[in-house]
Amino acid sequence: VQQWGVAMATATKVITQLRNEGLVSVTPGVGTVVAEVSPTRRPRLAQRSPADSGATAERIVEAAVAVADAEGLAAVSMRRVASEIGVATMSLYRHVADKDALVMQMMNAALGEWEEPDAPPERWRERLEVAGRQTWELFRRHPWLAPAMSITRPQAVPNALPLAEWVLAALDTRGLDMGTTFTAYITLFNYIRGTAFNIELEAEAQAQTGIDNEQWMDHQEPVLTELLTGGQFPTFSRLIQLDYDFSLDRLFEFGLQRLLDGLAMMVGDNQ
């Protein structure tokens, strides 16, 4: 980065894109290197014929989501999106007022991927489990989505309502007042969203360092072991002996079940 005068943010975006397309890979102790064998590349936007080469709201949002999925929301700009679909930047403004409006449409498109199961569970807990896992998968597919959404200043995104309605309807059968029901829904959503924040942060860290979280922990183990040699933290020291495999997916599922355990106790349901 210093040698070539490239900003860290720019280098991070480029490396992330190359990794997503299978052109580079992470080598332990070395960093990011050119991949020996090119895996299946990340799907790119379909090439359009001259007849349908004009900008449309759908194409603009599709291109913006693809950029954000690959490189993060910071990489999305009107100029970048116009370049992706092969049109002049100013032509986008006939369909989207500005980047803030574009991000709103991106969120709406991503949340619109949620579909109610064909055979939804009847019991409230099973329904919330399904909703929680579906929401987690949405954030997995679109790492930028969790940071883009707000709990304290919620955006009016139409496609957020079907999922919210589905969860609220399940909780509404438990005899809670509407305020408590809504608070339970927000708590569930914010837990999933908060955990999902780490997805994009980890992707950025991998791009910057060239190592994944497991390799990073391996590098930290000698330092941590030295910190624990004094015997001041005997309980924590026992963790060093464990072959603990950290996983965001496992962390999410553990927290989801404990949160639902708490709701079950609150509504007096031992299902």
Predicted regions and their residues:
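Append "Primarily bacterial transcriptional regulators
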Residues: 1, 11, 18, 81-82, ...
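Residue cluster at the C-terminal edge of the helix-turn-helix DNA-binding motif
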Residues: 3-4, 20-22, 70, 84, ...
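Short coil turns linking two alpha-helices in DNA-binding domains
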Residues: 7, 85-89
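HTH-adjacent hinge/linker in prokaryotic transcriptional regulators
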Residues: 16-70, 100, 105, 109, ...
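Ser/Thr-centered, proline-biased regulatory motifs
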Residues: 29, 74-80
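Hydrophobic alpha-helical connector segments
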Residues: 117-156, 162, 185
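Hydrophobic alpha-helical bundle segments that form small-molecule/ligand-binding pockets
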Residues: 163-189, 195-214, 218-219, 266
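C-terminal peripheral helix-coil segments that are non-catalytic and often amphipathic
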Residues: 201-271
